[in-house]
Design a protein with these regions (language model features):
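Conserved active-site motif detector
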Residues: 1-99
Length: 99
């Protein structure tokens, strides 16, 4: 089933990656962020080719988060892409994936 979640963007990502923006044709991997000191159940979003730091995370109250954590805990892998959607005339970064 296709899922869309808002992306909590990692403000440190541009400096670490050297990218000034997210490539249009991107691929991301969803995985537990075991190095997140603030959230033991953080779901990180890693941009393909940049494994050192996550591009961002799913929000704690995201409606897809529990299902994503279950899938990851069962040994599943989740991939998708990031896109910008316009909502109420605001550009919002979202991660689109299949669950």
């Amino acid at each position: 089933m296709r899922r869309v979640s808002n992306l909590a963007f990692n403000q440190e990502f541009p400096a670490v990656s050297g990218l000034s923006g997210i490539p249009k044709d991107n691929r991301v991997k969803l995985a537990r962020d075991l190095r997140n000191a603030f959230d033991a159940d953080a779901v990180g979003i890693w941009l393909e080719g940049f494994p050192l730091v996550p591009l961002g995370w799913l929000y704690r109250k995201d409606s897809n988060r529990e299902a994503v954590l279950r899938k990851l805990d069962e040994g599943g892998t989740l991939t998708g892409h990031v896109e910008v959607q316009n909502r109420a005339r605001k550009a919002i970064k979202v991660v689109v994936f299949w669950l």
